[in-house]
Amino acid sequence: MVLHDFWTFFIWSTVAGLAVIGIYQLFLLILRARGVFVTRTKFGLTMIFDSEDADSTPIRLLNVNGTFQSVSYIAPELRFELCVHYHRMMAKVIQQVAPEGHVVVMGGGGFSLPKHLATHMSGGVIDAIEIDPKIVSLAREHFFLDEALAVASSNLRIIEDDAWKVLQNADAGSIDVLVNEVFAGRKSLGPLGTAAGAQVVKEKLVPEGVYLADVRCPLEGRGSALLSQVADVFAHEFAHVAYVPEWPDTPKTPGNNLLIATDADIALPEGAVVVK
């Protein structure tokens, strides 16, 4: 009786497993038939597909494990321009404070911001850190990274490593602008959302350096405490802290909120909320 039950369980488990595999393979076939490139990377199922923005301009998107990580224009004349508003704000701040400086971007994805900086700044050094070599390969194949490297007017260095480890090992006072996109999306800011992380950021920046971070959360409701918590942490280390909400008129909508922390007196983007 026990043996019979075992084989019954084994057979039905096998059938169920094969059914799941079959459904998954069918799902992949449907996506590929619709022009979606599907693969697996370090952090899960990864999809690349083309679409259009609100102005009907063709764009390409990178989605990793259900979270959009990057977006790029497809047209050759637009490939190194920025699609999203918070990236454009970041670029303006960087051009303001360090047009020929050392910029470190934590998190690669499709390398939208590093590509833009490398092709719009002259004489600067941009370090773009991505932990997953496969994501770097996808950026080269689908997001025009090699094209940007070929025409860059600044030194764009691609570093395949853990961004937090690279930051910890950086020389003190060696970075003009530090951009944190590593923990954007559904994850918290990890070590960089703590007091110890803020201290490391302060140590690695030049005296009037700037820290920029994408803090994805709503302004009100569930999950909204993240933004104020991170702002408070950095307010203990920097003279000036502000954030620019993506969706100020719909505060319960999760958005890419731009956090700015610095000891310098800089011109803040329009719509900035001053914390300190």
Predicted feature locations:
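The AdoMet/dcAdoMet-binding core of the Class I SAM-like
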Residues: 79-212, 216, 220-231, 237, ...
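Residue-level signal for secondary-structure boundary sites
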Residues: 70, 221, 267-269
